[in-house]
Every structure is written in C-alpha cells, then in structure tokens.
C-alpha cells in the first residue's frame, strides 16, 4: 500500500469527504419531498410565491435603509456624499449575504418543488392550474400554454432546438447531489448522459427566487437556445421569466429585457461582449446588463480553461492599416521558404547517405545534416518518417546535446548555413544572416530588415554638437526610421510563421474567402476569433484572400476576469478532475465528482502504438471494418479537419458508409449525431467536446456491445481524451474505447517518443507491428501531464498580466459608470478637485504651483510664497480646495442661470415639439454641443444642463484616455520581455511600469476634466451697442435620442495560443519582436461617418462631445 492509499484509508479520499458533506442536504430534500408532492397544482405554485416572499423579507430592513440613504443624497453636501455611497455599498453586500442565508434555509423545499413539477410533467400530458396574469401573457406567445376561462393548461411537450420534445425526466438522488454542489458555488463533474442539463434546473430555480437574475452560460448558441426552450417551461410554470440573449440583437431593447428575466441563457462570448459594450455606452438607455449575481457555466472546463487564453476584444478601425505591407513582402517570404525547403531536402538526402556509411566520422556528419534538416523544417513528412526508423531519432538527439552544451555555445555552427531557424516547442522562427541577405537582394539598403541599436544611436546624438532644435529633429528621424523597420521585420516574421508553422485544414480553414481558426479542443470553427499581432493578416496574405485592415482595441477583457465578477459562480462538466488544481488556484472553484446513477460498463483499452502514421491509419480502418461487421456503431475522433477528410477517403475506397462531422460541415451536426448510435453507423468527428448531444443506442446495438470509440491520436490534454471516451457508456450502457497512436504524432514527436522509440528498437519491432502495454499508456499520459503543466503555466502567467489591466479596468469602468448614471458624478468631481489641489502643492515649487492652479483650476494661488514655505501642505491643500469648490459651485450656478431663461422659453413655447435640446458650451479652446432632456432641464431649473455637461465631458475624457492606456499597456507587455536577458522578471517590470502608466492616465483624466469644467461657459451673443436687445444664447434641437448602434464594431476573440502571446507568458521564450502601437494618423472629420458604424455623422454621434 502506497503512502497516499494509506492516508486515504485513514481520512477517506476527497470524493468520499465531499459526499459526506452533501448527503445531509439530500436527506433533507427527500424528507421535504412527500409533503410537497401531496400539494395540488395551485398549492404547488403558491409555495413558490411563498418562498419568494420569505427570501425578499429576509432583508426588508436593509432594503429600507438603502432607500432612505438614496433619498438623502440630494440634500447632502457634495463633499459628504462619498460616505453615504460607502454605506449603501456595504448594506447591499449585507443584503446578498441575507439572501444567501435564506436560500440555504429554503433549499430542501425549493428542490422538492422542482422535482415534483418534473414528475407531474412526466406523468401528465396536461396540467391544469388557475390562470394568473403571467400565464395569460405566456399563452399569447408560447404554444405549450393555453387559457380556457379562468384556467391555464400547460402541456408536457414543446419544441426545443428545432425538435418536438416530450418531458420524461425526474431527478435521481445523484442529480440532487449535483444540484446542491452547484448551489454551493462549486463545480459538479458528472459523466456523459447523467443529465447535467436537468441537474441545473435545481440551483437555477432556487437562486432565481431572489429576483436578482441567474445566468446559465453555454459554449455555443445552439445549446443556449435549445436549453432555454427545453427547461424553460419548468420555470415558467412557477411564474419565473426565461429568455436567451442569443435570440436578440446586441444593444437592443429585446436583449435588455432578456437580462431583466429571472433566468437568462446565453453563450460565454455574448455575456462578455455585452459587458464590454455596456462600458462603451454613451447613455444609460444603452446598458443591457444588471449586477452579476449568479452564473452556472455548462462545460465549465471548456470556458474557464480552454478559452482562458482568449481575451474578448471590441476594436474599431484605424484609418491606416499595414495590410499593404503583407502583400508587398509575401513574394520575398515565399522565395525564402522555397530556398529553405530545398535546403531541408538536400540535408535529409545527405543525412540518409552518410548515416548508412560504416565510417564513424561520416555517420557524425550525417546526424549533423539530419539535425540541420530538422531545424530547417521540423514538420517535413519525409523527415518525420526517417526519424521513426530504428536508432535515428536517438542519434539526432545525441547530436543536439553536443551543440547545445555550454548554453548553446556551438549552435551557430548548425544554424549558419540555414535561411531561418524554427524552434517548434517555443513556437518561434528566427531569420539568420543568410536569410536576411537573400531577401535584401540587390536593395540599396543592406540593413533593410535589420533593427538598429536605437539606444546606441540616441546616445551618439547626445554627444554631437547640435542645437536643441536639431537634436529633436534628428531624434524624430531616428525613431521614425526605427518604427518603420520594426514594422517591416515584424511583418516578415509573422509571414514566416504563417508559411512554416500554420497548416490549412489543421489550425485554420478558408471558407468564403475568409481565414477561420479551428478550435484545437473541439474541432469547431471559432467565429470572430483572430490570431493576434498581425499573424492572422499574414495567414490571409499567404492564402491570397483579402487582408483585413488593422484595428485598435477599444475594450477588452478575458473570460477569466469576466466570470470572477459574479457574486457566486458554479459549473458543470464531464471532465474537470484533471484540471481541479487550476480551477481552485485561479477561480477558487472546488471540483466535486458526482457518482453515476448506474455503474459505467464501458471497456477502456490500452493505447495501440505504431511506428508511423501510415501503419496507424491502416490499423484504424481495419478496426472500423471489424466493428461494423459486428453490427456496432463507431465514433472516430480526430484532431483536425485534414485527418477526418483523409480517413473519409480511405473508408470510401473500402466502400464503408460513414458520416463526417468537422469544422467545415458543422451545419449537419444535430442530424449526424442523432444517427451516430444506429447499428453499423460510422461517424468521423473532430473532437466531440461540447457537442452537448448524447448518442442514444437501440436495444440491438446494446446487445452487440454498444458504441465503439476510436481515437486516432492522443490529444495534448487528457481531459479532451476523456471527453471522447465519455461519449460511450452513458447511463450504464455497454461500450468500448481505444486510442491508436504513432511515434509521428505531434504529442509523441515533441514530448514522449524518445523512450518509447528506444523500447521498440530494443525489442526489435518492425514496421507494421503494434505495441500495446499499460507502461506505454502511462508514458503517454506523463507526456500529456507535461504539456498540461506547460499550458497551465502559460494561462496563469497570462492571467497575472491581465490582472494588472483588470485592476485598472475596474477603477476606470467604475468611474465611467458613475458618470453615465449621474448619481455619483458629483462625488467623483469633488475627489478630482481635491486631487488637483493636493498635487499642485505637493509636486511643485511656488511658481510651479501658481502655474498649475491657473492652468487646471483657473484660479489664483490663495496663499503667499512665505505661507507656501512655512505652512503644512495639508493645510494649504484644504484652503485651496475650499476656494476651488466655491469657484466651481459659483460657475455651475452661473451656467444654469444663463441657460435657464432659454430652456424656459423653448419648453413653454415649443416643448411639445422637442424631446432633447443641444446647448453649446465652450472652455475657450473647443466648443462642446451638450445634449440634454428638455423636460428634465426645465423642471430642474437647468441644473440638469450642468449634469449633462459634466457627464459628457467625463465620458469623453475617460474613453480617450482608456483607449490610449490600452495601447500603451499592449506595447509595454511586448517590450518588457527583454528584461529576462538582464535576469529580471518581465512580469515584475510590467507591474511597476503599468502603475506609472495608470497614474499618468488618472492625472490626465483629472486634469482635462477639471480644466474643461472650470472654464466651461455658454457663449452669449452680445447685442449691438445701438440696439436695446437682450443677450442671446443660441440653442438647437437635438436629434431624437437613439440607442447606440455598435453593430459595426468588430468583436473578436484574440487567440492567445499563438506564439506572440505565449511570449508574454513564458520567460524563457526566445527574443520577441517589438510591437509598434497602432498609430491613428488621420483624425475623423466632423462630417465624416462615425467610426462606431451607426451610420450617423461623427458630429451627431461620438463627436457630440468632441
């Protein structure tokens, strides 16, 4: 007995402890169930209303206190409001805690209500209840409810995901276990076919009773729509509203209503993008989301782990892109790649000839030539085949060790004759001097593709005898040239990666003239995802499709940081146990394995290992043929579109009928999966993860041995392999699974084949022979663990980088939301004024202080130089702040006084014609047209005009500063990688530098906002001296208020699995290319179309405040 087994025998394993903790809850539910089941239909529904009332009343006093504090805000001095808002925030947290306690108390009854309802729908075709207003509203839009007199009749069948569904499910005890786990904010791991969708109904129903909203998150829109239709009637029967955000257009009233529903279904991407859109809104009417209360994430491992490297980005166009550069440099790269291919072939031929020699020196030269061929093109199929021969790979690895000794001391001898060097494990391509010479050719500038040492050049300039003007001019010239060269070198590198490391129909497909990334985990097309840092444009140039223009990031967030905003988060999946450590480290989510309702009868066989891919695929086809003859259905899992199409051709040649499900044919998914369990059916599918549809078997198929799973390759992640195996053996069905592996597979080639190859060599295995042993399967699993650890390191590192931005984003978005909603804007402005006063005194001498107070706060210094030197800085800051606040109040009152007669006149004479009014306000430099609701302005005696001015300026200043900050952070992330050469941690440097950038941004926001607000005045047209007419303010009718149209912003998931992003996550990655920030060189004209895509002119949209 091992030590771990010994400990488990004393303390029990985790699974046993989890079950022990949850079992009492299940017993309470079972005890409450008979009483609930005995209720009639109306009493059952009344019980739900009773629970809602109990939960709401648990925090009655706290809610009353919040309302009282909110009512007191208007009469509270601006300076004292911060304390009031802090009290409100504290009490709102207490309310959530009270609700959580109440939910625990009613859990057994609530779960019993759901189970009793499921039973009634299963046993009755129709359920008759007394009709409520909600039922009548429902009957007008849903087919499964009809009204007859004062009765509402619910049917037990409805349409879900395009199929007619009859409800026939009642919760098992293990599903009650799962429901408790989800309510507790944990991850429930349940095997395929155990009814995860049904389990979710329990915690969703319970948490929806608070009225704060529950989000059910799925991986694709088909599942989101299907599950909302499938489970919806169960909730609606109890008066809970259900909607799905993917049914409605972004930024629409319908989508806003979907978020106001008690239960909201949707995809992870859309929830994230709606959050970003809300933080770009220019009016409260544009907001769709409310507080992030409780989310249940389906296929939680896919969302929180596989997609974690992929931030959501909303970007807008920049006037000038670098797409032309990709087209211009493509022929040079093609010439380079062809030259390298010829070189790789030459070295391989040379290696084969020399290694066959009996001369020891020639054999050594042969292995050097082989190693050079490997460095040229590691994915060369002829090379991979030769490496699988006995003793060849081991010989090449010995050669590699020799040249890598003493920190790669002799590596230059290997790489000098090559045009570029590929490091496959590091995902990097480096040009050599020979490669640079080839692409420079007869160019006048031999350094066309060589980055100069900019620091040395700038230092040289300082030593020259130049005037300040000349020095600045020369510096500008140097920096401009460096930027141009940097972009050129970067483009060449990205094109090289596109040609040598990314294969069509493997990493991506080309459909309708567009390059679309294929998700390596699921085989699905990732719509809207683009590789970052110009790599996607490079692939577009390679495939000769339209190269999309460059864009600038307007808003971004990772799914990790989005989901961490929820008050409570839980998830369910069939495979999370292998990633339990990561889910706890990053999200503090505990994984609980729920036992199956019936024991699993699937037979999982050892891996079958072959030397070459050719032998492996031949064996796969023979195995399929044998299984089909036995009358069993077969599901063949592949890792790429290319392999699925190749196997399809091989089966067609053998005249075996089959279906193919891959990224190119995903439209037929439901139809193909529905038939996959028929006798003799053969289905080839790129990884089935997240398909969300069970393969049901007929009695004849079960008798023949059930569904057979064949994996054609081990995936990098054990979890994806487990997902594929899990398609067979659902709910105790028979089945089998086996993986066919070759030493040429990517996982084996890069991480594991050395040991297995040497074992096969020693045992004298010949081509065509197969090895099957537990030791081999364990060795492959160790390789997978190695890759998983590496990927976890990358994700954790990326999250550490994003955490820096996330803290900044939280501050900026909070400030922006205050401005948008208007409630706390006064408090923020007071803080800004204090900050400016304190800064002016803290960071300057007396003259500097005078200048800053004049420039920012438009005020004279209220103390003498002697007082400045002798008095405490806090005292001076307080004195300055008090005077600044008096000035500010006086100016805002004056603004309202000037606007009010005009507002009064327009409202009383033409109020029925206008809803909004445009008021011109200037700070002496620029004119701002402020849109304000005419009625609100009239009723507030133009105080609303001042609020609208403050809000417009703050939103405008924050948005511009945040965009610029995102750009600078992106550039910083790339530039800090060089710190590793100085034995410094790039992340630490990034954190320190980002604080400096953030402080500069906050100062900029505060300075600009206060400067404009302090100088803001309505321009008054003076009457001519000889005419006795009053002064006149010019106002205009504003366009009717519209919701912000964001339909033409580009939403994308930036793929962080590409090398450029991994660089930021791995310190030992080779030297990275510096990324130049995207330069918005051309400004948008006032009469040009607005870049947001609304179709309106810039001056009438985002340019209103500009």
Curated annotation (Swiss-Prot):
Cofactor note as given: May bind 1 zinc ion per subunit.
SMART domains xrefs: SecA_DEAD, SecA_PP_bind
Subcellular location: Cell inner membrane; Cytoplasm
Reactions that this protein is recorded to catalyse: ATP + H2O + cellular proteinSide 1 = ADP + phosphate + cellular proteinSide 2
Positions with biased composition (Polar residues): 1057-1067
Basic and acidic residues biased stretches: 1042-1056, 1068-1085
Main location, first listed in the record: membrane
Annotated InterPro entries: Helicase_ATP-bd (IPR014001), Helicase_C-like (IPR001650), P-loop_NTPase (IPR027417), SEC_C_motif (IPR004027), SecA (IPR000185), SecA_CS (IPR020937), SecA_DEAD (IPR011115), SecA_motor_DEAD (IPR014018)
Superkingdom: Bacteria
Binding site residues for ATP: 175, 193-197, 694
Protein topology in the membrane: Peripheral membrane protein
Residues covered by region (Disordered): 1021-1106
Enzyme Commission designation: 7.4.2.8
Keyword NAD: no
Any GO BP: intracellular protein transmembrane transport
Reported cofactor(s): Zn(2+)
Entry keywords, A to Z: ATP-binding, Cell inner membrane, Cell membrane, Cytoplasm, Membrane, Metal-binding, Nucleotide-binding, Protein transport, Translocase, Translocation, Transport, Zinc
GO molecular function list: ATP binding; metal ion binding; protein-exporting ATPase activity
Functional note: Part of the Sec protein translocase complex. Interacts with the SecYEG preprotein conducting channel. Has a central role in coupling the hydrolysis of ATP to the transfer of proteins into and across the cell membrane, serving as an ATP-driven molecular motor driving the stepwise translocation of polypeptide chains across the membrane.
Entries under NCBIfam families matching the protein: PRK12901.1 (NF009536)
Protein name: Protein translocase subunit SecA
Species annotation: Bacteroides thetaiotaomicron (strain ATCC 29148 / DSM 2079 / JCM 5827 / CCUG 10774 / NCTC 10582 / VPI-5482 / E50)
Lineage: Bacteria, Pseudomonadati, Bacteroidota, Bacteroidia, Bacteroidales
The gene coding this protein: secA
């Amino acid at each position: 007995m091992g030590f771990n087994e010994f400990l488990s025998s004393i303390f029990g394993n985790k699974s046993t402890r989890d079950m022990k903790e949850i079992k009492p809850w299940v017993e309470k539910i079972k005890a409450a169930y008979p009483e609930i089941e005995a209720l009639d239909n109306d009493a059952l529904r009344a019980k739900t209303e009773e629970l809602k009332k109990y939960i709401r009343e648990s925090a009655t006093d706290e809610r009353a206190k919040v309302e009282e504090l909110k009512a007191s805000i208007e009469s509270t001095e601006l300076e004292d409001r911060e304390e009031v808002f802090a009290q409100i925030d504290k009490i709102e947290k207490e309310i959530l805690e009270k609700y959580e306690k109440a939910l625990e108390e009613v859990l057994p009854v609530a779960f019993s209500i759901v189970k009793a309802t499921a039973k009634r729908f299963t046993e009755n075709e129709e359920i008759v209840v007394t009709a409520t207003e909600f039922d009548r509203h429902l009957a007008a839009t849903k087919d499964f409810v009809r009204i007859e007199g004062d009765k509402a009749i619910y049917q037990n069948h409805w349409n879900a995901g395009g199929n007619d569904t009859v409800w026939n499910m009642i919760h098992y005890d293990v599903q009650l276990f799962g429901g408790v786990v989800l309510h507790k904010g944990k991850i429930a791991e349940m095997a395929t076919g155990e009814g995860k969708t049904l389990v979710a109904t329990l915690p969703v129903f319970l948490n929806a009773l608070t009225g704060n909203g529950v989000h059910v998150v799925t991986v694709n829109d088909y599942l989101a729509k299907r599950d909302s239709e499938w489970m919806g009637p169960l909730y609606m029967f109890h008066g809970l509203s259900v909607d799905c955000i993917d049914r409605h257009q972004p930024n629409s009233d319908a989508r806003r209503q979907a978020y106001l529903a008690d239960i909201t279904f949707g995809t992870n991407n859309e929830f994230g993008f709606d959050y970003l859109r809300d933080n770009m809104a220019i009016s409260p009417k544009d907001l769709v989301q409310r507080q992030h209360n409780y989310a249940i994430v389906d296929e939680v491992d896919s969302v929180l782990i596989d997609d974690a490297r992929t931030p959501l980005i909303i970007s807008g166009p920049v006037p000038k892109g670098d797409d032309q550069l990709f087209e211009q440099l493509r022929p040079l790269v093609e010439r380079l790649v062809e030259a390298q291919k010829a070189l790789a072939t030459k070295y391989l031929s040379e290696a084969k000839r020399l290694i066959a020699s009996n001369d020891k020196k020639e054999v050594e030269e042969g292995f050097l030539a082989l190693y050079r061929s490997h460095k040229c093109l590691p994915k060369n199929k002829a090379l991979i085949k030769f490496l699988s021969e006995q003793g060849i790979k081991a010989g090449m690895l010995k050669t590699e060790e020799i040249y890598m000794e003493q920190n790669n001391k002799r590596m230059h001898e290997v790489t000098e004759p090559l045009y570029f060097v590929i490091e496959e494990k590091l995902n990097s391509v480096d040009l050599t001097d020979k490669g640079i010479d080839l692409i420079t050719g007869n160019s006048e500038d031999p350094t066309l593709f060589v980055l100069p040492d900019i620091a040395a050049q700038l230092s040289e300039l300082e030593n020259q005898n130049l005037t300040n003007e000349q020095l600045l001019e020369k510096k500008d010239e140097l920096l401009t040239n460096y930027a141009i060269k940097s972009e050129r070198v970067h483009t060449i590198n990205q094109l090289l990666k596109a040609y040598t490391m990314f294969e069509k129909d493997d990493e991506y497909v080309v459909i309708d003239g567009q390059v679309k990334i294929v998700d390596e985990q699921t085989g699905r097309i990732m719509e809207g995802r683009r590789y970052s840092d110009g790599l996607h444009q490079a692939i577009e140039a390679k495939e000769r499709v339209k190269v999309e223009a460059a864009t600038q990031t307007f808003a971004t967030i990772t799914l990790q940081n989005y989901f961490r905003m929820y008050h409570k988060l839980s998830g369910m999946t069939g495979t999370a146990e292998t990633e339990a450590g990561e889910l706890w480290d990053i999200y503090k989510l505990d994984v609980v394995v729920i036992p199956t309702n019936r024991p699993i009868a699937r037979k999982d066989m050892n891996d079958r290992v072959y030397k070459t891919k050719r032998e492996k695929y031949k064996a796969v086809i023979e195995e399929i043929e044998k299984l089909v003859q036995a009358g069993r259905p077969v599901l063949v899992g592949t890792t790429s579109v290319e392999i699925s199409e190749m196997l399809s051709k091989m089966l067609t040649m053998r005249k075996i009928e089959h279906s193919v499900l891959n990224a190119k044919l995903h439209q037929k998914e439901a139809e193909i999966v529905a038939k996959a369990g028929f006798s003799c059916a053969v289905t080839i599918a790129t990884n089935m993860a997240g398909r969300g549809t069970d393969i049901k078997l007929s009695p004849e198929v079960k008798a023949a041995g059930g569904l057979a799973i064949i994996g054609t390759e081990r995936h990098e992640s054990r979890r994806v392999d487990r997902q594929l195996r899990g398609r067979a053996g659902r709910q105790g069905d028979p089945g089998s699974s086996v993986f066919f592996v070759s030493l040429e597979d990517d996982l084996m080639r890069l991480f594991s084949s050395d040991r297995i190859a040497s074992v096969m060599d020693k045992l004298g295995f010949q081509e065509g022979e197969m090895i099957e042993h537990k030791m081999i399967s364990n060795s492959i699993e160790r390789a997978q663990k190695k890759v998983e650890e590496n990927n976890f390191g990358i994700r954790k590192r990326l999250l550490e980088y994003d955490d820096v931005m996330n803290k900044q984003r939280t501050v900026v978005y909070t400030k922006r939301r205050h401005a948008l909603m208007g409630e706390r804007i006064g408090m923020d402005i007071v803080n800004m004024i204090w900050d400016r006063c304190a800064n002016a005194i803290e960071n300057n001498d007396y003259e500097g202080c005078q200048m800053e107070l004049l420039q920012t706060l438009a005020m004279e210094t209220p103390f003498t130089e002697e007082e400045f030197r002798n008095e405490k800085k806090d005292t001076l800051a307080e004195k300055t702040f008090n005077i600044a606040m008096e000035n500010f109040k006086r100016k805002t009152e004056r603004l309202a006084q000037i606007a009010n007669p005009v507002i009064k006149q327009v409202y009383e004479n033409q109020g029925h014609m206008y809803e909004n009014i445009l008021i011109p306000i200037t700070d002496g430099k620029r004119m701002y047209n402020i849109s304000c609701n005419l009625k609100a302005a009239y009723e507030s005696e133009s105080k609303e005009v001042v609020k609208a001015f403050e809000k417009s300026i703050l939103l405008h200043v924050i948005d511009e500063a945040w965009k610029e900050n995102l750009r600078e952070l992106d550039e910083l992330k790339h530039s800090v990688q060089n710190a590793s050469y100085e034995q410094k941690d790039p992340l630490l440097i990034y954190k320190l530098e980002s604080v400096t950038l953030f402080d500069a941004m906050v100062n900029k926001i505060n300075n600009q906002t206060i400067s404009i607000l302090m100088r803001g005045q309505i321009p008054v047209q003076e009457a001519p001296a000889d005419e006795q007419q009053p002064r006149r303010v010019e106002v205009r009718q504003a366009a009717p208020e519209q919701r912000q149209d964001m339909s033409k912003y580009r939403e994308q998931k930036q793929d962080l699995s590409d090398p450029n992003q991994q660089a930021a996550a791995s310190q030992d990655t080779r030297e990275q290319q510096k990324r130049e920030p995207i330069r918005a060189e051309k400004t948008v004209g006032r009469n040009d179309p607005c870049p947001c895509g609304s179709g309106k002119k810039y001056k009438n949209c985002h340019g209103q405040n500009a």
